[in-house]
Amino acid sequence: MEFAIFLNGFIPGPAAHDTNMQHLSYQREAEYAIFADKHNWKYCWLGEHHALTEYSQLSAPEVAIGYLAAQTDYIHLGTAINSLSPRKEHPVRYAERAATMDHYTNNRFEWGTGRGAGSH
């Protein structure tokens, strides 16, 4: 059996507008990923959302993945999901970043794509 954890920078309610809480959320979720790595969990998935105040504060999962790759040894780190919107960015740019991340994580990068909740 394989285990995974999903992280998205969740900050509930009024705390979502507190920049200190955002920092603490990032640190706490990094600790979850490091704990999961030490306990042989297979995957850590990081969501991507923009301009949401009470659901997800994580707008740059690739940055978080770079940090987590340096702090972990075994767990696979992935985006959940990158929404491919040509209006936002050309899909080739996503492919380039995924290939680069795979090198820096020693083949532990997992790229997830699909239609997100806010996709149109």
Describe each model-derived feature in a short phrase:
Residues 80-86:
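Conserved strand-turn element in the central/C-terminal portion of the radical SAM core barrel
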Residues 1-79:
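N-terminal beta1-alpha1-beta2 module of alpha/beta enzyme domains
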Residues 50, 82, 116:
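Catalytic metal-binding/acid-base residues of hydrolase active sites
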Residues 2-22, 86-120:
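Flexible, glycine-rich active-site loops centered on histidine and acidic residues
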